[in-house]
Amino acid sequence: MSFRQKRTRIPLLAMTVTALAAAVCGVTTAPAATGAEVAVPLSVGAAAGNATPIPGYVIQSSAQVSDDSAVSKPGFPTSGWYPVSSRSTVYAGLLQNGKYADPFYSTNMQNVPAAQFSVPWWYRTDLNVDDTSSRTYLDFSGVLSKADVWVNGTKVATKDQVNGAYTRHDLDITAQVHTGVNSVAFKVYPNDPNRDLSMGWIDWAQTPPDQNMGIVRDVLVRRSGAVALRSAHVIQKLNSALDHADLTVKADVRNDSANAVQTTVAGTVAGKPISQTVSLAAKERKTVTFPLVGLDRPNVWWPAGMGGQHRYDLDLTASVGGTPSDAAKSKFGVRDVKATLNSSGGRQYSVNGKPLLIRGGGYTPDLFLRWNETAAADKLKYVLNLGLNTVRLEGHIEPDEFFDIADDLGVLTMPGWECCDKWEGQVNGEEKGEPWVESDYPIAKASMFSEAERLRDHPSVISFHIGSDFAPDRRIEQGYLDAMKAADFLLPVIPAASARPSPITGASGMKMNGPYDYVPPVYWYDKSQKDRGGAWSFNSETSAGVDIPTMDTLKRMMSASELDTMWKNPSAKQYHRSSSDTFGNLKLFGDALTKRYGASANLNDFVRKAQLSQYENVRAEFESHSRNYTDSTNPSTGLIYWMLNSPWTSLHWQLFDAYMDQNGAYYGAKKANEPLHIQYSHDNRSVVVINQTSNAVSGLTATTKLYNLDGTEKYSNTKTGLSVGALGAKATAVTVPAVSGLSTTYLAKWVLTDSSGKEVSRNVYWLSTKADTLNWGGSDWYYTPQSAFADLSGLNNLGQSAVGATANSVAGADGTTTTTVTLKNTSGGRLPAFYVDSKVVDSAGKPVLPVEWNDNAVSLWPGETTTLTAKYRTADLKGSKPSVRISGWNTGTQTVPADGSGPGPSDPVDYQAEDATIVQGAVESNHAGYTGTGFVNYDNVAGSSVEWTVTVPSAGTYDVVVRYANGTTTSRPLDFSVNGSISASGVAFGSTGTWPAWTTKTVRVTLAAGVNKIKAVATTANGGPNVDKITL
């Protein structure tokens, strides 16, 4: 918003702010707040240009209110009302007050009575005004979806006037305001995205029970003199040489007094003075256009990785008789954006004359629209950590601060309207969303004007989608275009995210052909299927659907029985996938996982196989588009992965989850989007080097190696002297020939080194001699079935390997800590340590999130070493010392200290029971006090066992410290064996009193240097104790 000033946010109450922060993180345990009121009314200053956000409200159902006019009268009793933050839906406010259990867990949200949200809810607050000589306004948008507005007992706007989530309102309440305490109240009406031009959740997640009714943006209390200054902005035009920009400053001045006035509007733009005097009749409004300002050698704004992110300031004051009346401040960037159609009809974006491949994801806010600036910044930092450059916002257009963050980070944004509800109800046939009535047209036009005004000066914004699945009809489109013209929104306008054209703007240059559910990696490379989602043109939203989170997150979001159903019966309805029947289960994904990787033995096995599947699929999706970007015909020009993140704890459409944890999909995307990258083509076996940096590179060496699963090398090739251009250019290193004697499942490793021999890219694939074959003729809009499946089940028999690990941490002055982890394959033989994942954890074994790794999910052959770094907020350790939990497909799990003191040979290493091999037992989490993601509950049978794979640097005697619980009154003995030989028999594990009471037992064993297997076997019909972990 061009006139929005930077400000310090004013807390509602310390208690409620803390509760909100917890709620945004998915924790909804907050102090009860019934009977509480806002402690002190907001003091509203009288200075010209003062814009103070209302810090919070108390809310209550209108069913509890008998007299509407009384609510906004000072002194109205609000005992029993709920204090909420400045931007809060009704349900979010009730969560903030601890009224309902964590909605991110299990089916808790399903149990919330929805009837209470079928009536309006009141939002009430008090303002303290000491000086009424200034005029007073309420300036706001973000009401879902309509409201009556009351001030001091007077209705100043009706729900027919305040209608639409994006419409902006500037209510002059000067006549209602008096000295002292004043009261403002919004009567917010129920939201229905199918009937209202607001926000809905389509098939992304379960719909909140209140459908997000509430106020989700700031309401500003503005003060000014007779003349109000609005809509200050800069139209900038950058020349092709990037060495000069012309700046045109415009602003609206409005005389709200009953007398004619003369006002002088003066200030600076990019440090250069400007001034103009204007005469205004009573109640007259004029647009002031200042003379052109030239800017030589401007600091041009660039996307991240292409240059800097400089922004200039605009600072204006409107004065009457030499006295300031109103003021406006804003920032803007100097840059040029184009989005033209190439010869194949695809949409090609360029910034400052440089074409670029759009690589992004579909962004979503929190399911309850709870704004958290830190969380939003974390998400956009993940975008850069992934190597992406763009986010698409389909509806749910975030507040001003979001775009400020994107501007500062250099993340491109593609906002636009959403599909599948009222926004497209006039044009989408039988799909959801009611057809428009006459009153919808001005609301849509006003929404477009408001958002265009707000977004136009943000250099991160590169276009606006006026349609998603469907383009608007002529009347709707003309309204949008007229609004954009009036708002001086000069960026590209995209008629639809699909291939549907609009009557005026014409072709979209984009496609939305799916898939949205499982397809194999080879799918993405096929350009011959013109109605499918392969890597050609601009793919505005697509993915292989399911993205299973890590076990850490799954334990936080689903009950034990739900997790059991998830892996045993993927065809069952999954509440945490989607409300849609099409995407309500995991059947397509589960079937493919079993056919390609083999049947899952247990939950852990299902989850780890899911990570491999997601990694290979997401990697292929991005790699195929990067490879095809420079094709001479029908190139790929953009890919928006569906989606970047999920609004809640979800099983699909996410590169990272609601808790910011990173799964296989994340690391597959990160690998594919390395700045300088070597990759394999699933369709034609070519090995290609992609350079996404701004500089050409030469002197590269590409090495190819193929291995059977027993470690035998079957093919090797080295290509030297490779050169590759900049900004998405590619060079082919080799095409892998047919190789005889490969195992059905085999491994491939590609390494790219620079002219100094330094490794700059490593990429490991697990492949099959049996191909995935697609049945294109059986395609549906959301997936394409397979007639044959690759066989990757050989990975289940990959022999054990060993990883040695050391870690160290350094806390920085900026409040972050960097943990460095060095991994080495210490096994003898030929087997790699495959898919080794590292996590920074706190003293309780919980992941420290968010975290930015330079690389992860790595594979190392014997003797190979890699060093990883992880950066995170020191405060997220919550006072504990960091450790690193390291788990690999064939290495077991270990936890090494990383507390900054430096690891030594005697440092203990933890091995979690839930990551071990379990026979006749189950991983559970129903008793508190465990570490990691759970514990093992032995079946009540002799012979049930847990077997850990451990690594030690040298042969000798070691203490195995077993952390266990036994809630019975009898001992549950275990036999311990090492590498198949009994080491300790009948070790007693006595009662601990209760199951949540944990203690330790030490068992001394003799281990060989390198990899060992330690098995603990129950010797009685009672089975063993619950085992949390062993520490070696």
Curated annotation (Swiss-Prot):
InterPro entries in the record: Beta-gal/glucu_dom_sf, Beta-mannosidase-like_N2, CBM6, EBDG/EBM, Galactose-bd-like_sf, Glyco_hydro_2_Ig-like, Glycoside_hydrolase_SF, Ig-like_fold
Biological-process GO terms, alphabetical: chitin catabolic process; polysaccharide catabolic process
GO cellular-component term (any): extracellular region
Stated pH dependence: Optimum pH is 5.5 with chitotriitol as substrate, and 5.3 with (GlcN)2 as substrate. Activity is lost below pH 3.5 and above pH 8.0.
Active site: D469 (proton donor), E541 (nucleophile)
EC number of the protein: 3.2.1.165
GO molecular function: carbohydrate binding; exo-1,4-beta-D-glucosaminidase activity; hydrolase activity, hydrolyzing O-glycosyl compounds
Localization (cell): Secreted
Reactions that this protein is recorded to catalyse: Hydrolysis of chitosan or chitosan oligosaccharides to remove successive D-glucosamine residues from the non-reducing termini
PROSITE patterns, sorted: CBM6
Keywords: Carbohydrate metabolism, Chitin degradation, Glycosidase, Hydrolase, Polysaccharide degradation, Secreted, Signal
Presence of the UniProt keyword Membrane in the record: no
Keyword flag Transport: no
Function as written in the Swiss-Prot or TrEMBL entry: Hydrolyzes chitosan and chitooligosaccharides with retention of anomeric configuration. Has maximum activity on chitotetraose, chitopentaose and their corresponding alcohols, with a slight decrease in the rate of hydrolysis on longer chains. Has no activity against beta-D-glucopyranoside, beta-D-xylopyranoside, beta-D-mannoside, beta-D-glucuronide, beta-D-galactoside, beta-D-N-acetylgalactosamide, beta-D-N-acetylglucosaminide and alpha-D-N-acetylglucosaminide.
Family per similarity comment: Belongs to the glycosyl hydrolase 2 family.
Protein name: Exo-beta-D-glucosaminidase
Biological classification of the source: Bacteria, Bacillati, Actinomycetota, Actinomycetes, Pseudonocardiales
Gene symbol of the encoding locus: csxA
